[in-house]
């Protein structure tokens, strides 16, 4: 017999991180893999570059997100260009984060995303637009121009126009989880209904239940 640390799947960790950031909440994720062996861990650096208040406790293998306002205003050209060739599965979570970021995020070198469970570039563009987001795309890129729900002084941002609605998951687990998380960040009275949301079971069968233990408001 032997003891072995079983690390978290960074592709799964992305969703609670983004959910906390877009709702200006705090969450701690335990059992984090700090070995650098998973390319998707780079999403933390991307979120930090947007102003995400994220700390990594390497001794406890935990990651904590605190209340943050996401923006690209401090970046060159006022935009974030990120090459996702090493972790293309992050497209769904980052696209949702982009909807709540003051500025523009351009995700590049993601042509492979057109050959996943769905064409994730086309699908995310279509469903985010359905909810009021400004999204453009090309053969191997997608851009999201968003607005923070709050201004720098903490007051409500009148330019934040995302709204609720019914969206398709296309039986793609990452699409379903990302769009469900988007709904958490909408103003009171607005909600998102994801069709066939249970398709997330292919990778995270307890996703909604675990999120609800951390004060999400999912019903299914």
Regions found by a protein language model. Name each.
Residues 1-220:
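Short, structured segments at the rim of ligand-binding sites
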């Amino acid at each position: 017999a032997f003891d072995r640390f079983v690390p978290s799947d960074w592709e799964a960790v992305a969703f609670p991180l983004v959910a906390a950031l877009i709702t200006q909440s705090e969450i701690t994720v335990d059992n984090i893999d700090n070995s650098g062996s998973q390319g998707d861990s780079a999403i933390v650096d991307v979120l930090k570059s947007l102003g995400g208040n994220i700390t990594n406790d390497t001794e406890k293998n935990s990651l904590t997100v605190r209340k943050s306002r996401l923006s690209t205003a401090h970046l060159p050209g006022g935009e974030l260009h990120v090459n996702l060739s090493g972790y293309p599965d992050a497209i769904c979570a980052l696209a949702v984060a982009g909807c709540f970021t003051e500025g523009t995020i351009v995700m590049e070198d993601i042509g492979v995303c057109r050959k996943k469970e769905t064409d994730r570039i086309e699908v995310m563009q279509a469903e985010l637009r359905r909810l009021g987001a400004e999204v453009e795309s090309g053969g191997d890129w997608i851009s999201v121009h968003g607005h923070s729900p709050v201004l720098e002084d903490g007051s409500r941002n009148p330019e934040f126009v995302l709204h609720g609605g019914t969206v398709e998951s296309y039986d793609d687990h990452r699409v379903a989880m990302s769009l469900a998380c988007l709904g958490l960040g909408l103003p009171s009275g607005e909600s998102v209904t994801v069709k066939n949301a249970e398709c997330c079971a292919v990778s995270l069968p307890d996703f909604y239940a675990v999120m609800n233990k951390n004060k999400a408001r999912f019903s299914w």
